[in-house]
Amino acid sequence: MLKIIIPTIMLIPLTWMSKPNMIWINTTTYGLLISLISLFYLNQPNDNTLNSSLMFFSDSLSAPLLALTTWLLPLMLMASQHHLSKEPLTRKKLYISMLILLQLFLIMTFTASELIFFYILFEATLIPTLIIITRWGNQTERLNAGLYFLFYTLMGSLPLLVALLYIHNFMGSLNFLMIQYWIQPLPNSWSNIFLWLACMMAFMVKMPLYGLHLWLPKAHVEAPIAGSMVLAAVLLKLGGYGMMRITTLLNPLTNFMAYPFMMLSLWGMIMTSSICLRQTDLKSLIAYSSVSHMALVIVAVLIQTPWSYMGATALMIAHGLTSSMLFCLANSNYERIHSRTMILARGLQTLLPLMAAWWLLASLTNLALPPTINLIGELFVVMSSFSWSNITIILMGINITITALYSLYMLITTQRGKYSHHIKNIKPSFTRENALMTLHLLPLLLLSLNPKIILGPIY
């Protein structure tokens, strides 16, 4: 693990010591190199001795998320260049350092082998994100958004700490690799039901579960571009990852407790998709679509069959790349028009034809067009939920239809129609933006050729 962690730490002095005109290029190139090292972890042999130590271990669930995290840093840096072009030099360096610090915490969270260590790092990711949102956001509401973000996450995760101490007392260890072999199950007592709720609530808020999701649209809308990208792509996956790690420890309690949460997720999935159909704000629409996709992941994790786990991991990776790409596109619109309202940006297809092609591809991956891994993930989840209960197929079908509707609605409102006169003298799309879109789409397309490397713990 250190062969990723140490280079990531060294990116911070690299940023502060670079020449002013080389900051972006240095960090981006070295970030890409680190992400190429992390691809090594995707090859998981059966005797997984190479990748485990006392502090860190990686298995086939954390490896894809690790690769996604490291892949995102250079993309965030590429996307932020225009946003920070007017800032003084030290502030640029501070911004890049925050992103690197956040990536460091995330890498360590996904590979921590101890539950308390995992908890500390899970909370530590909050700090750089909060600074990025409240310092570099666009509107003044960003302070409000930061407050929501902080308090929702903290309120959710404090009971988890108490629950972990209790589990440590009960089982004698909190090491992931040791607890897997613990034979004695937790009985269905009232105290253990509260224990389950305490464990799950932190991750449900992070996912977010419908009803606990109010911080997400706020944080997404107010965050700068890199904040939105990392929030949608990786921070939401922390919730899914934590749930997949902890639900297996708490059986048979999970089977007993899962019903209300699954109902809430299935209901919330349709509700948030319907909210998307009425949005005027572009970033808000993408944020709500994230909530509905993550509701699918919650359902999959709570069903707890091999198929649903495969679907959940595939969907998490696919959604990470897709939503990040959509935020980049929304940001490139925002940099030209200085408004997030979709109607004001209509008719862009005639002015920026290549950008319209990227919009089309991003919308199609968002609505899970057949060859993409989004579809593979959704199919696995739909099949496993159908075998769990036949009625869910109706809800899933409605949700998939509404997803297709709002994705196409987003595409049509931003790209088609007659353009308004205030955007005639718009800047053309930069090579940087096209490269950014290519680097988002490339993994999606390549993974659809060989999806089994991201199907998680079963393979």
From Swiss-Prot:
Its EC number(s): 7.1.1.2
GO molecular function, one term: ubiquinone binding
Catalytic activity reported: a ubiquinone + NADH + 5 H(+)(in) = a ubiquinol + NAD(+) + 4 H(+)(out)
GO CC list: mitochondrial inner membrane
Compartment annotation: Mitochondrion inner membrane
Class in the EC hierarchy, top level: translocase
Example GO biological process: electron transport coupled proton transport
Cross-referenced Pfam families: Oxidored_q5_N, Proton_antipo_M
Keywords carried by this UniProt record: Electron transport, Membrane, Mitochondrion, Mitochondrion inner membrane, NAD, Respiratory chain, Translocase, Transmembrane, Transmembrane helix, Transport, Ubiquinone
Transmembrane spans: 22-42, 60-80, 93-113, 114-134, 147-167, 193-213, 224-244, 256-276, 284-303, 308-330, 351-371, 391-411, 435-455
Membrane topology: Multi-pass membrane protein
Main location: mitochondrion
Family: Belongs to the complex I subunit 4 family.
Subunit structure: Core subunit of respiratory chain NADH dehydrogenase (Complex I) which is composed of 45 different subunits.
Role noted for this protein: Core subunit of the mitochondrial membrane respiratory chain NADH dehydrogenase (Complex I) which catalyzes electron transfer from NADH through the respiratory chain, using ubiquinone as an electron acceptor. Essential for the catalytic activity and assembly of complex I.
NCBIfam families in the record: NDH_I_M (TIGR01972)
Protein's name in the database: NADH-ubiquinone oxidoreductase chain 4
Underlying gene: MT-ND4
